[in-house]
A protein has these predicted regions:
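Glycine-rich phosphate-binding loop and adjoining beta1-alpha1-beta2 segment
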Residues: 6-11, 64-107
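N-terminal charged helix/coil linker that caps or initiates catalytic domains
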Residues: 1-44, 259-267
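Structural alpha-helical scaffold elements that stabilize or flank donor/cofactor-binding regions
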Residues: 37, 126-127
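Hydrophobic residues within alpha-helices
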Residues: 55-56, 99
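Hydrophobic/small residue at the entry helix of a nucleotide-binding pocket
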Residues: 51
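Conserved N-terminal Rossmann-fold NAD(P)-binding element of oxidoreductases
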Residues: 46-47, 70
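E1/E1-like adenylate-forming module used to activate ubiquitin-like modifiers
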Residues: 112-114, 119-120, 127-208, 212-220, ...
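Generic hydrophobic/aromatic pocket-lining and core-packing "Φ" positions
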Residues: 35, 56-57, 148
Length: 267
């Protein structure tokens, strides 16, 4: 189902700045207005490992005009089997800086801001204030919950993705439209990230995340509000589960004006 968006006049100067030859294959789906929305949007990609690396590449290639890339880590040899923005010459460099350089080559018109810092609640708040959409490329739940809380306060959509081995999941959360990310968080959000992954898994999951972001920015398609896409690539199969928010402690706490994740999760 296509979400109805408010009609807006075409900005002729903005169209002239677009290289429509680059985006000709997607204009039939998004239209010129949709492409202009992408070019005027800002997306924060948090975590530039397997998921965030590919998500950033697809977003830049699709014509998103401004990207914020957040990751404190440096490139390691074990990243190179799936994190295609890096090469052997990037080992030891900050992921955010190396990715920004590569994306600048892919889309010279885009504004790309590398942030080689660790995510904390204050940075999550800054990202939620600045970005139109936040894309989760993280590998730990506590950091995801910081993003969830900040995006909820700011009323910004957060696209969540996770991948391990040959499995993954994707959903979109937004205040007033869906349950929150805490509804599907594990009981121990400080659980370590995955250590076993194969490149095609992050390719599939990151593609679904980018599609969610494009839906949100253009109004084309139906985001996964209150639904969780569960991906099993051993079969392969994608099952979409309905999410309920009947007794989510975080949702109830927010409705009552509380935001204490530490007390909610015992961390």
């Amino acid at each position: 189902m296509e979400e109805k968006v408010a009609w807006e006049p075409l900005d002729v100067r903005a169209i002239e700045r677009l290289d429509l030859n680059v985006y000709s294959r997607q204009l039939g789906l998004l239209g010129v207005r949709g492409q202009l929305r992408l070019s005027s949007s800002k997306v924060a990609v948090v975590g530039l490992g397997g998921l965030g690396n590919l998500a950033a590449a697809y977003l830049a290639a699709s014509g998103v005009g401004r990207l914020i890339l957040v990751d404190r880590d440096v490139v390691e040899p074990s990243n190179l089997n799936r994190q295609v923005l890096y090469g052997k010459g990037d080992v030891g460099r900050y992921k955010a800086v190396a990715a920004a350089e590569r994306l600048g080559e892919l889309n010279p018109e885009a504004e790309i801001e590398p942030v080689p810092e660790a995510l904390d609640p204050a940075l999550a708040e800054d990202l939620a204030r600045e970005a139109d959409v936040i894309v989760d490329g993280l590998d730990n739940w506590m950091a995801r919950l910081w993003l969830d809380a900040a995006s909820w306060r700011r009323g910004k959509p957060l696209v969540h993705g996770a991948a391990e081995r040959m499995h993954g999941q994707v959903t979109t959360v937004e205040r007033g439209r869906s349950s929150c990310l805490a509804c599907i968080a594990p009981s121990n959000p400080e659980r370590a990230g995955c250590t076993t992954i194969i490149a095609p898994t992050v390719g599939v999951v990151s593609s679904l995340e980018v599609l969610e972001a494009i839906k949100l920015l253009t109004g084309v398609g139906e985001p996964l509000y209150n639904r969780l896409a569960v991906i099993d690539l051993t079969t392969p199969r994608i099952e979409v589960l309905r999410l309920a928010q009947m007794d989510c402690r975080a949702c109830l706490s927010r409705l009552k004006g509380g935001e204490d994740l530490a007390s909610l999760y015992g961390v």
